[in-house]
């Protein structure tokens, strides 16, 4: 039966498009993000590592933004989306945004589905999309933009 097991969904789920590997992973804690980046580096040592973090909950971002930044600094280029607030309200966390993470990482940038074309300049890359929120909205935007 093991040969029929395809692994857990949203744990380093890969899709190859040309010379780019898109990875979908549920990583939403700095330790999990570190594991995804390490796996990507080991599996694709010759590819540029370009993670996209989708921070989940405002409180987690506030608590761990420096830890996220320290882990993500190991990548070649980093993109961070807006925080997915889930059940939380931004008004309860003044001053907390994904910019906390971005400002800690030299060269890091904000990204959204409208800004997905920023990823097209990364050739021969592995792009892990990481977070609790299903990143299909970003991955689909990436693919749709390629077809234009």
PLM regions with names:
Residues 1-148:
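ATP-dependent carboxylate-amine ligase
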